[in-house]
Amino acid sequence: MKKLIYLFLILASCNSKNNDSKKLPTNFEGKVVAIKDGDTYKIMCDGKERTIRLSHIDCPEKSQPFGKNAKHFASYLCFGQIAKVVSEGKTDRYKRLIAEVYVNDICVNKELVKNGFAWHFIKYSDNEEYADLEKQARQNIVGLWTDVEPIAPWEWRKK
């Protein structure tokens, strides 16, 4: 019995080391090599492509009004640039690292909301700065807020 317990402890410690080595770094820099849509990017770091899902925001879907605009605006801001990725290490159900992305000290996430290419994703974020940026974009009637009745992406996906 003691041998089984000892064997279990050894295997458990080996397994935890393997899990730790697979974790993504929470903060890193890399080159933006693809813009999948307004809020999902691929960033090359240390020879590995990492998929990033922007935190605090939700951009229109590609098939949705302003979806292509959000992607083009994101491309303009950061495609081909060196980006700093800041994350708490959380991933979404698609295993994308959830993070803020900075290019030239500008937060891409905030710029998308500020310019009306994203909603503050209140289901997953209670950040007041993002709420204020969305409120300002609505008041300034920019981007998707020029639409008479913009549909939030989480509602669009229900269709």
Task: Describe the predicted segments one by one.
Residues K2, F8-K159:
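Small beta-barrel nucleic-acid-binding modules, primarily SNase/OB-fold domains
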